[in-house]
């Protein structure tokens, strides 16, 4: 059985403490994965039938279970902290206290208002104090929180806060550019607009030169 790691528990607890956790129920945590997939597929079957789709059709008959598996194992896998990435934190023995920036992190999420895709990129930076982290883990943490029904504002703050607590520093900054298909494909149908959110703390917030380096350094 996969257990929730210490780092995953730290992440979850700090988000709960700060009121930044997603609105996740606890009642269904004991449902096994396969049972959850089947239950979701049953409801999807009903939804598709109410849309007058013929579920006997060769192309559609397996769609409910395909969507269900996609929800549980892929696009909403970030709802389960057992899927939180394994984190490699190291003592900053080399005394590196300059800015570390990871650019163009691919994020694919889902709008929690319409259950339609949000996709874009994040740039994340930190200035180490006592701890440093494997670079790919920054990407994986960001992608973990993206794999939930989300709003971009919450996602931005979640990533920042979790990195702060794991890295034991306030010096973290993040900016996210995303395209919302709830804007592109419905409602206003604006295919050219995008949404930008940012969150800065520590030296990124208090020091103008560091802030400008984060936003403008290539």
From Swiss-Prot:
EC number of this enzyme = 3.5.4.16
Source taxon at top rank = Bacteria
Q: Which GO terms describe its molecular function?
A: GTP binding; GTP cyclohydrolase I activity; zinc ion binding
- Keyword annotations: GTP-binding, Hydrolase, Metal-binding, Nucleotide-binding, One-carbon metabolism, Zinc
PROSITE patterns per the record? GTP_CYCLOHYDROL_1_1, GTP_CYCLOHYDROL_1_2
Q: Does the UniProt entry include the keyword Nucleotide-binding?
A: yes
Annotated pathway: Cofactor biosynthesis; 7,8-dihydroneopterin triphosphate biosynthesis; 7,8-dihydroneopterin triphosphate from GTP: step 1/1
Q: Which residues bind Zn(2+)?
A: 111, 114, 182
**Which residue spans adopt a coiled-coil conformation according to this UniProt entry?**
none
The reaction(s) annotated as catalysed by this protein in its Swiss-Prot or TrEMBL entry are: GTP + H2O = 7,8-dihydroneopterin 3'-triphosphate + formate + H(+)
Metal-binding keyword on record: yes
The record's GO CC annotations read: cytoplasm
Please give the Pfam families that the UniProt record associates with this protein: GTP_cyclohydroI
The record's Gene Ontology biological-process terms are: one-carbon metabolic process; tetrahydrobiopterin biosynthetic process; tetrahydrofolate biosynthetic process
Quaternary structure and partners: Toroid-shaped homodecamer, composed of two pentamers of five dimers.
The family database entries (PANTHER family) matched by this protein are listed as: GTP CYCLOHYDROLASE 1, GTP CYCLOHYDROLASE I
Task: Spell out the family assignment given in the record's similarity comment.
Answer: Belongs to the GTP cyclohydrolase I family.
Identify this protein by name: GTP cyclohydrolase 1
């Amino acid at each position: 059985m996969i257990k929730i790691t210490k780092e995953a528990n730290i992440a979850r607890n700090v988000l709960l403490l700060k009121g930044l956790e997603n609105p996740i129920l606890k009642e269904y945590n004991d449902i096994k994965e396969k049972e959850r997939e089947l239950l979701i597929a049953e409801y999807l079957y009903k939804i598709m039938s109410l849309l007058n789709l013929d579920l006997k059709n060769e192309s559609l008959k397996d769609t409910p279970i395909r969507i269900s598996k996609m929800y549980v194992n892929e696009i909403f896998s970030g709802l389960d902290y057992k899927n939180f990435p394994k984190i490699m934190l190291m003592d900053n023995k080399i005394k590196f206290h300059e800015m570390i920036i990871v650019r163009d992190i691919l994020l694919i999420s889902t709008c929690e208002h319409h259950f339609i895709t949000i996709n874009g990129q994040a740039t994340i930076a930190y200035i180490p104090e006592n701890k440093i982290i494997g670079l790919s883990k920054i990407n994986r943490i960001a992608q973990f929180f993206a794999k939930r029904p989300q709003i971009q504002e919450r996602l931005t703050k979640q990533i920042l806060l979790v990195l702060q607590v794991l890295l034991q520093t306030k010096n973290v900054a993040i900016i996210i550019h995303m395209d919302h298909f709830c804007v592109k494909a419905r409602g206003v149908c604006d295919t050219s607009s995008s949404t930008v959110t940012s969150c800065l703390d520590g030296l990124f917030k208090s020091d103008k030169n560091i802030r400008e380096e984060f936003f403008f350094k290539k």
